[in-house]
Amino acid sequence: MHPGIGFAILVTAGAWIAACDGSLREKIGQSDIDASVLMTIQPPKCDPSATAADSGACTGGGQPGSDCLMCHHQGGPASPYTFAGTLYDAAGAKPVAGATIYVEDSAGNLATAITRPNGNFFTADGFVQYPAKAFVSLCPDVLEMIGAVDQMTGANCNTSGCHTAGFRIHLP
């Protein structure tokens, strides 16, 4: 086979045989034509304002917008959360209460949380597979997170490399 040619054609007893060099990408999300499984997850309906069971205040000293999973992780000093963060208005200044946060993985496992009066949201509901897709819903808006929640960044929404002081989780 000539270097740089992706396949070879062999002649054997008058029959043509093609051989592949293995460069095809047929794994989910890796093909030029296949879509990611996450693209099949539909946005939730528009949710009316909900009321959380508590204020969302952290008794350990955490503040809205700070790193929730610094303490709230397996083996940490506080009860572990699956995901946590703070929701703000579009300007990133005022906390938004009563919104529903959805995180759904590619296997269909769904975890939800309601934003507290201080904008904090958190849950211990389990989803077990990464990547996952996140939405925030509060009528009339339903917003989808642009990127996937992945194992590398985890579901520590306030510090996963995106949602820090300059780019808060927001609605709308």
Give the ranges of each region predicted by the language model.
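Sec-dependent bacterial lipoprotein signal peptides
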Residues: 1-18
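Sequence context surrounding c-type heme c attachment/ligation sites in exported
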Residues: 19-98, 103-172
